[in-house]
Amino acid sequence: MERQSMALVGDKEEIIRKSFEYHPTVWGDYFIRNYSCLPLEKECMIKRVEELKDRVRNLFEETHDVLQIMILVDSIQLLGLDYHFEKEITAALRLIYEADVENYGLYEVSLRFRLLRQHGYNLSPDVFNKFKDDKGRFLPTLNGDAKGLLNLYNAAYLGTHEETILDEAISFTKCQLESLLGELEQPLAIEVSLFLETPLYRRTRRLLVRKYIPIYQEKVMRNDTILELAKLDFNLLQSLHQEEVKKITIWWNDLALTKSLKFARDRVVECYYWIVAVYFEPQYSRARVITSKAISLMSIMDDIYDNYSTLEESRLLTEAIERWEPQAVDCVPEYLKDFYLKLLKTYKDFEDELEPNEKYRIPYLQEEIKVLSRAYFQEAKWGVERYVPALEEHLLVSLITAGYFAVACASYVGLGEDATKETFEWVASSPKILKSCSIHCRLMDDITSHQREQERDHFASTVESYMKEHGTSAKVACEKLQVMVEQKWKDLNEECLRPTQVARPLIEIILNLSRAMEDIYKHKDTYTNSNTRMKDNVSLIFVESFLI
């Protein structure tokens, strides 16, 4: 709800502030009070997991048929177990790549294409030409092959620019699957419905695992060893995630910023959910906690510039962040002093958590926050001036205020040896994959949020920029920007097929940032309005465990 408030400046001047009141935290102290897994129970689960992992390794050794190897790899990935079997999957992919596929049907060709593309193999989409007639149309004999169509549908979303056959495949398979949906038996109908809502490649891993395990359980051809391992692994990781979100919630409560800055969104659990979408594996625990804290403070910053501060107050805060020293607090408006000092202290705490040879990472993150604050200030100026920039000019600033340059940098700070000084130099160089991810984030946010924000006298979003530049309605502008979102996905796919100077897991983190946007901002801003779908998803991942 929008409201107005007044603040005295000196003895005379009054400031009329526009501020948006957000709903309070959905979760409060829930994760401090509730913890489900006892130490002895966890110890038994870990022992059983190790036994099951040995059995699955034996499956890799005993499976020689290429199709069965593909199904095994696919199942393990869909169930979130691939981080246990990286060596085995790497060897399996080489076999899959070298296999003779001459006699493969739609299901097999599509599955192979998707698995290999997901892992950076630049496989040609020409493999699908044999499923077209001499007029370039997909063969009518494919129409009833639901499993083949679903695999082609999911494979086609790994397409890059100029791969028109994959664009055609999406249109064809989507139409066919929608028409078949009412005739399909379970669990295939649920699986098709799940991926029609959001394609496999664009889904966040943890939420996919939580929704796919019940589907896999109903499959006739399921492997019960893999199923049990998936459930136990999910529960063990959930226990770890509960510990982390408890720790972060305690930190957030001690910070108490949303008690003094009541105009800011209180969304620390949702921030943690966001980062679990980026990396969920146990080896990233330190990184998750650091990044969740960093993004929570970025959210407060966003609301300060966006919802409450005057232009002069924004300027003073920006200058203080530029200086990044405790003495600069004297220049910050009174109501922001606590925020400023706690921002600096949190980053000092980050530095203290790092090993001596890792401390060089913090200045890179500090610089990204400085760049972010300057961009926030530029948007604040546009708002005061009622300036509507052209789309290209807008994106030069708003791809930064999307926050993903800073979040990407933060997500690398707590990593182990994979993140090097060259990694942080690479982020600072604004690589194409990170630009595409940031623009994707900005456009999805604006498409979803622009109407609500314009109702409260917000500065122009990319939607308004497009409307002004092209003389269109908001509806048409959103449709055109959605086309740009699809183009950004193709940019991301293309960059994943090119050699880079950073390790593949670090590229995957950037992809996962875009997947998080698909989850959180598709159709609705569920971060701001977190008592809707977001609440259900948080519960699915952090509260509801599997019965074994």
Swiss-Prot record:
It comes from the Eukaryota. Its EC number is 4.2.3.104. One of its GO terms (molecular function) is magnesium ion binding. A motif (DDXXD motif) lies at residues 302-306. GO terms for biological process: diterpenoid biosynthetic process. The keyword Metal-binding applies. This is Alpha-humulene synthase. It comes from Zingiber zerumbet. The lineage of its organism: Eukaryota, Viridiplantae, Streptophyta, Embryophyta, Tracheophyta. The gene is ZSS1.
